[in-house]
Amino acid sequence: MRPDDINPRTGLVVALVSVFLVFGFMFTVSGMKGETLGNIPLLAIGPAICLPGIAAIALARKTEGCTKWPENELLWVRKLPCFRKPKDKEVVELLRTPSDLESGKGSSDELAKKAGLRGKQLPQGPGEVPMASSVTTPTPTEEGECQSLVQSGRQEETSRYLDGYCPSASSLAYSALDAKCSAWDRSDRPEPEDSIFFVPQDSIIVCSYKQNSPYDRYCCYINQSQGRWDHETIV
């Protein structure tokens, strides 16, 4: 930038159109005196020569010598269909953070529907854990309210399955998401997460319903790729 805050390219544009400005001004003054060029009055020729030069200088100032697009001007051009960029679906999915799901924004409802559909479509074997039929996300203010995630007919079967691996004595001392579980072998299971905001795509939701327990109705998920039904599954 020059000390006078004029871009050198803008000065070049002014130098090129100065000829049109001079002749346009001269023709305009002469036309005001009534002079004509044949049958054409000079008052009509002067502005026609001068105005394009003024527009070129104004455009050069707004674009800093034709080097950048004006930010606040010509906004109507950006609204045209040819200037609109389509949003990529993958980018939109990546923008959905766990905080959006926790606050009720984004795809929390869609996630619940998908989990319910997976629970109905996938067949169940005799040794598999029942799939979830619906998913609800209770907020911290609704500690006493928790809807059933397992069909009513499967609750007893799920409780018996969890009792085999989580005795009632140990369930009083540890939470399902607690990292300290000395009764289990930690080498064969992944580290539990501190908080779960969403259910993974390929997972099975398991709920425990125990009476006289501080963790009466807690839910967790089992990743199918990490679970082994023939040996032991850590919940």
UniProtKB/Swiss-Prot annotation:
Membrane topology, as annotated: Multi-pass membrane protein
Chain segments carrying region Disordered: 99-146
Pfam family, one: TMEM215
UniProt xrefs under InterPro entries: TMEM215 (IPR031486)
GO CC term (a single one): membrane
Highest taxon of source: Eukaryota
Main localization (coarse): membrane
Localization of this protein: Membrane
Membrane-crossing segments per the record: 12-32, 40-60
Annotated GO biological process: angiogenesis; negative regulation of retinal cell programmed cell death; sprouting angiogenesis
UniProt keywords, alphabetically: Membrane, Transmembrane, Transmembrane helix
Protein's name according to its UniProt entry: Transmembrane protein 215
Organism: Mus musculus
Lineage: Eukaryota, Metazoa, Chordata, Craniata, Vertebrata
Gene name of the record: Tmem215
